[in-house]
Amino acid sequence: MDDKDIDKELRQKLNFSYCEETEIEGQKKVEESREASSQTPEKGEVQDSEAKGTPPWTPLSNVHELDTSSEKDKESPDQILRTPVSHPLKCPETPAQPDSRSKLLPSDSPSTPKTMLSRLVISPTGKLPSRGPKHLKLTPAPLKDEMTSLALVNINPFTPESYKKLFLQSGGKRKIRGDLEEAGPEEGKGGLPAKRCVLRETNMASRYEKEFLEVEKIGVGEFGTVYKCIKRLDGCVYAIKRSMKTFTELSNENSALHEVYAHAVLGHHPHVVRYYSSWAEDDHMIIQNEYCNGGSLQAAISENTKSGNHFEEPKLKDILLQISLGLNYIHNSSMVHLDIKPSNIFICHKMQSESSGVIEEVENEADWFLSANVMYKIGDLGHATSINKPKVEEGDSRFLANEILQEDYRHLPKADIFALGLTIAVAAGAESLPTNGAAWHHIRKGNFPDVPQELSESFSSLLKNMIQPDAEQRPSAAALARNTVLRPSLGKTEELQQQLNLEKFKTATLERELREAQQAQSPQGYTHHGDTGVSGTHTGSRSTKRLVGGKSARSSSFTSGEREPLH
């Protein structure tokens, strides 16, 4: 048996794929192969003769798999038999492979003989194997590898199902992660964790210290600590939130990503604190959000309490309206906040330099807030959940609706309306709300807390309607956003629009009556002209035409039955 037959037999038994061993070794082999293919025939023959004189060297891990003769084993040097056993390439994009397959992979250690690798990559003719579809069929990717690769991608629970199927399908063959989890335990053996998140820390040095300059601590909450930071690259100020608990201390890793999921799906809205980025660092979750220079509404209320002041009714209406717009956006995204309270509402003051003194023309009435000097935004989405598939985690009990406590989730958006009503009560100067007891239940019966100011009857009635016991009867966020109590100008606009429509209807009616009267009083003396002149009269016609030259038509008028001469 010659060397070519031996090579063919080895290739059949080893069943090696023609892809590169590793990224570094693969690049080297491709370069060597290209040099070999570009050589002259004489040099190629010399190289082949040298290769024939050297038997194929096989790593130890593969020698045991092959039932080769003792003569071939003797031809391999001892140092070749001591080649370390190869392992599959481990990188973030490649899940761990089963042990049975790893035995068939060639060694990727530096001591692997180059002649063996060159024989595996270079064909006997000295040409590189094709990288087209035919070559790719030699190493088909099993379904298990495709499923395990999905373990490296988190599936956002707030993403609509239609979008999940859209971006996770590949020619109708790929399943979404949720389907794989329900496929059975035998598919889970390939490395797909059942319901475990992918929390992979950055490989760089501290990204927080590298990209941001910490200015001061601006808040401490249930999730963690918030810092005011300046990004070194763009010089802008951001709010960086660092989780208080580590991933190992959390009972469920999903809770660490819950707020990230909600922010990512919501996108950008003027009345929701903007989300920019997030990453894992030092076993903690870090979220980069928009910085609100006015602090929280709770901080403003505390300052008012110290000075004996409170927000007046016009300001209360402004807060209620802007937060209603933010809630309407959240609810339209099939989500609920479930933790609306003063400490989760943030204030942004428009800088004086941004005001040009020119009155801005608002093209869309929904964009009126763009010219506002003070913006109120909803933040802290740690308790947000889906309306269709709710996983409710109770927020602050002082602002909690009774139906949530009773686990009645039929009208989840109305729970946000209830909490918003009590938030306005606190901003109006109400005393601290009870956390439980008889006073807590007294409010849940529809009794609005006492406030140290006289509110208008219409506004007071609206606030009481927001906290009534029947959740279904509470106004929606969309209804609040278009309520004439909060937006009197909107009511005036609608009234003017109705008047305009009425006047248009009257005008159309008069025009129709005028046309009918003109048709009834039309003159009877019009004549009809043919090619030869006046041929008679045409009753009911309002105009006549005279053909000039048999082709062009010109209008003509008559005085006392005589035709007017042409000029």
UniProtKB/Swiss-Prot annotation:
Its EC number is 2.7.10.2. SMART domains: S_TKc (SM00220). A motif (Nuclear export signal) lies at residues 315-329. InterPro entries: CC_SR_Kinase (IPR050339), Kinase-like_dom_sf (IPR011009), Prot_kinase_dom (IPR000719), Protein_kinase_ATP_BS (IPR017441), Ser/Thr_kinase_AS (IPR008271), Wee1-like_protein_kinase (IPR017164). The modification Phosphoserine is found at S76. It holds the Pfam family Pkinase. This is Wee1-like protein kinase 2. The gene is WEE2.
